[in-house]
A protein has these predicted regions:
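Rhodanese-like catalytic fold shared by cysteine-dependent sulfurtransferases
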Residues: 1-36
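Alpha-helical transmembrane-bundle signature of multi-pass membrane transport and export proteins
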Residues: 36-471
Length: 472
């Protein structure tokens, strides 16, 4: 009954209303604005705002170009004579900046004009793409230069991320923030799904120079959008405490909120143990666990991408729910279970189904977590909060990749993926037991009955609710 009420908008009254309904008493009505249907039109509400339209168009074009390049990058490394191990090293160089620079980037975005920061760093990324195109066309590109440019590009991306996320929040009023985040996620997943396919066509028809050139041109979209958008700066007078002090303030701010602290622990488990199997181990699973070839690999990767796109569409509705904790936690646990089972699976149809489920649930969890952090953070702390979120999810990926590599050497590809999924699942269950209030992430205020349910010493409150309902 509580779930039935919650699904119809009575989130803040699910427990109390459930008790009343069970005993036949009148059900308390939710105040205006706390309930009601969440339809698809409301999920796209952010598109009504001109600033978001400009931001969304520029980012979508840039993301498409970035994923076209990402789809071809590893192939170009192999064309230059690089090994499979070198692919891993270059992947490490591209992702380690998220751990090194996330927090300083958050401080930067909280204290300076975010628009100017993004113009500088995105212009730098455009320069990296131009350098790749020119070097390949002139025959000067080497594996060493690919690694160097991968590190530079990863660093510029890590320094841009908090400013991008904070600018996103400034393009819409607070009531449409969930819609903006969901649409931003949809743009990312569509670009991720389509980009590598475009890269394959370009590589086969015109070669790597055009792949890198397309990415360079795509940055004109985001740079043009940034020129049209107004300045975006948090209301902070100066960096009076210094960079280290500002970083420490951000950490205290995030981990001083129990719900955000719990969410960050979940993000670490997701980044360290759930992401490496998807990012690095799919070819190994197909070759050594399923004993299949490139056709199966292509279908499996496509199903992960399709699940991600469908998850982003579902996020348009789910992100507008007052309670984002329950659907987010369910998706986290389902994604972890899918990873664990696919590591043990020898059935191609089962693996296809699990890939679709994993792509869907993973994107929903990450999208809802983004909404929660954005909405729960004050304007002057938002960039640092998102930087910590990025460090927790993406910054730990290189460490997770090393752990997964060690597990693979010991247990094989399937065993490593199964263990990664099991650790992710146990981590989520542990957080749920440690911080039960993680189930109500995103609620403006927990209903008293929910608060009581999180504290074993307060179950007397629920007994009083039952007695009051029975008397009524």
């Amino acid at each position: 009954v509580a779930h039935w009420l919650r699904d119809r908008g009575f989130d803040a009254y699910a427990v109390t209303g459930g008790v009343h309904a069970l005993l036949g008493a009148p059900i308390p009505e939710a105040p205006p604005g706390e309930g009601g249907p969440r339809d698809w039109k409301a999920g796209a509400a952010a598109l009504r705002h001109r600033r978001f339209q400009i931001y969304f168009g520029g980012v979508l074009l840039s993301l498409a170009g970035s994923w076209v390049e990402a789809g071809a990058f590893g192939y170009v490394v192999l064309l230059l004579g690089g090994s499979a191990a070198m692919l891993g090293i270059i992947g490490f160089l591209n992702t380690i900046p998220n751990l090194l620079f996330a927090l300083p980037a958050g401080v930067l975005a909280d204290h300076f004009d975010r628009r100017k920061i993004l113009l500088l760093f995105q212009g730098g990324n455009m320069g990296v793409a131009i350098a790749l195109a020119v070097l390949w066309a002139t025959g000067g590109l080497t594996v060493f230069l690919m690694g160097l440019l991968a590190f530079i590009g990863g660093s510029l991306g890590a320094l841009s991320f908090p400013a991008f996320q904070s600018m996103l929040a400034g393009t819409v009023p607070p009531k449409d923030l969930e819609s903006a985040v969901a649409l931003n996620s949809l743009a990312l997943q569509v670009a991720r799904f389509v980009g590598p396919a475009i890269a394959g066509v370009l590589l086969a028809s015109v070669g790597p120079t055009w792949v890198f050139g397309v990415n360079a041109v795509s940055f004109l979209g985001v740079l043009g959008a940034l020129v049209l958008l107004p300045s975006s700066r948090a209301k902070i007078a100066s960096v009076s405490v210094g960079v280290r002090g500002a970083m420490a303030d951000g950490i205290r701010y995030v981990f001083g909120q129990r719900s955000l602290a719990s969410l960050m622990v979940l993000m670490v488990f997701a980044g360290m143990f759930a992401t490496p199997p998807v990012a690095f181990m799919v070819p190994g699973l197909v070759r050594f666990q399923l004993h299949e070839g490139p056709e199966t690999l292509g279908i499996l990767i496509s199903l992960i991408g399709l699940g991600s796109v469908l998850g982003s569409v579902a996020l348009l509705v789910l992100a507008r729910r007052p309670n984002k904790g329950e659907p987010g936690l369910v998706c986290y646990l389902l994604c972890a279970a899918a990873i664990a089972i696919i590591g043990l699976s020898t059935s191609v149809p089962l693996s296809f189904a699990l890939a679709l489920i994993g792509g869907f649930t993973g994107v929903v969890f990450i999208g809802l977590s983004t909404v929660v952090v954005q909405a729960a953070s004050s304007e002057e702390m938002r960039s640092r909060a998102m930087a910590i979120w990025a460090a927790a999810l993406v910054g730990v990926l290189p460490i997770g990749a090393l752990i997964t590599a060690a597990l693979t050497a010991w247990l094989g590809a399937g065993g490593a993926v199964a263990v990664d999924g099991a650790i992710t699942l146990l981590g989520g269950l542990g957080v749920l037991l440690w911080r039960p209030e993680v189930r109500w992430l995103g609620c403006a205020a927990l209903p008293e009955a929910c608060v009581a349910a999180t504290d074993p010493a307060s179950f007397a409150y629920l007994e009083e609710e039952v007695e009051a309902a029975r008397a009524a």
